[in-house]
Amino acid sequence: MNKIKKVVIPVAGKGTRFLPITKTISKTLLPIVDTPVIQYLLEEAVQAGIKEALIIIGYSQNDVINYFNTESTYVQKLSKDYEEIKYIKKLKQQIRISYVFQEEAKGLGDAVYHAKAFADKDDFALILGDDFVFSNGLSTYGIGSLCKFYEKNPNYYLGVQEVPY
């Protein structure tokens, strides 16, 4: 059976439309209620059965790496008392997260090209770092529905969603 096992999430943009807050925090870490967008995107990938994620980050986005770092002594102490930290540990057990730096912003095509070694000739899902689809925990929504199509007929699919203004 054909399954998508990898996802690429480019988040290397500068977030200029969200200035001044994005001077200090990456756009993908901006919260929706109490959870950053990047966490929702990884949860969506896990619900779709994806096991590996590559997050493409820009030169000043170490905060994205730090968000998912559960190894520091400080985080270890926090995880004893706060379920939220334990949840990130659990998420990391469900999907292997790796990172690559896009040193110069040359657009989406260049960002995806940085995933060449990660993809290693496998087909993969691409979730844009600012393309949030609320799924209510349904695995057949968003990227999950595209993965289901792929399982039945391995081809290339594009998901779109109307954004009312």
Language model features by range: what are they?
Residues 24-39:
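Short catalytic helix/loop segments, enriched in acidic residues and glycine
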Residues 24, 28, 71-75, 142-146:
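A glycine- and small-aliphatic-rich helix-loop capping segment at beta-alpha/alpha-beta transitions
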Residues 2-9, 17, 35-126, 133-138:
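Conserved N-terminal catalytic core of the sugar/cofactor nucleotidyltransferase
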Residues 26, 94-96, 153:
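A generic structural signal for alpha->beta connector loops
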Residues 14, 25, 60:
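A generic "binding-loop/recognition-motif" signal
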Residues 29, 97-99, 156-158:
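Conserved beta-strand scaffold positions in the cores of enzyme catalytic domains, especially
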